């Protein structure tokens, strides 16, 4: 028996596109002699549809298209994730569901029992937990189907279960021979190995081969990495799909496979591929085929430019240098050299005259006051204004270039360098930016070495460096990880060996700059706690650094 694992990249709410992907994949599976094709969680609608689920017309269309899809595909049974209505008289109105489609109709269906409500997940807002998982017979084998979170309640892999029920235990007590999990599980650093650990635990514990079919593609801030897997009954990984690309795996149940050992690329390679896919999908799914990047000659804009070029192609990327009176010659040279290395269009628009015009206009109002960060921010806002004008005129998406460390500290300017439609590296700490830049330069230098090696500077005043107002990035990123990822208290972070005054300053700035981050463009989520939908803090609050 052959089973096709169809790792597709859906567009949320684009039924025509998603059905086209499903039809093409089922045709490939049928041609390859497969007995069953499997598609990811909510593959008909795309995940996560968020408040589209509150629109009755959207649910109606989803059900209409599901029945239409069933009638169009013949000759191969398949599993498809979709949204069903809750037939019960109480609870939330919807179910996160999966259907077995065979012979032109929905033959059987089941649903998701465990609904995540943490970080970026908010499924209890819309869905009622399903009463039944899907179980069906396939060539004298009993197949059980779970949906994403249903397999994440395994105590063996990381402490105590977080749910009262265990869908897997219930399925295995019913005697399933094959376990399938359809997922829309977003990427974070090192999540792939964790998923594999769970699958291995399940397969070995229940002596059941386990299939994992994951969505791929970028949907807003979330990156779905695919990496679908098949683990045999002994817990050995025997098949694995591409990371960050559509794929179709075929598992032959009668074939003997060698174990795949150490399947994961380096962290830098994985993060870079995720950012490239996320930038491409966000741009194209939003209708943009061209992007703009402001090139300062620094490492952050260089990193974003490389990602943009690899995501969109050199012909669809323009780099803009906007030197001020404080921009060094080496910054101007490095910006142009980078653009040449990437083969992207390069334009230079000096801002000297505009900057002086601003200062002249404000001269009387600012009479007697010393120049400070106000004048620095004027430069950033001039640049933001020019970039948005170019975006507007040429229909290109502006990519902002701030990293996570700077955004955490408010070391950025509202309506200036924060301008844009997508914050590509807003979840990349500065120390990781350096790691990515060095990775990009292997084996051939793309980002000028001087850009990486010289002290980082916003160049908004003479002889400025980032460390004039920020701790060294190794220290800053360590404190931020402790506070944001590990949720450690002030005292616990100090006990790690950091200076109390430094910790207090970092946590205070993290708190007071919430208002800036609320106005930032959406950013691509890479870590387990990014700024955005999964981190919800009040703006007007006490300043005690918890």
Task: Place the predicted regions along the sequence by residue.
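Enzyme catalytic cores with a strong preference for nitrogen-chemistry domains
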Residues: 1-294, 310-314, 321, 346
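ATP/NTP-dependent adenylation/nucleotidyl-transfer catalytic domains that generate, transfer
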Residues: 233, 259-297, 301-546
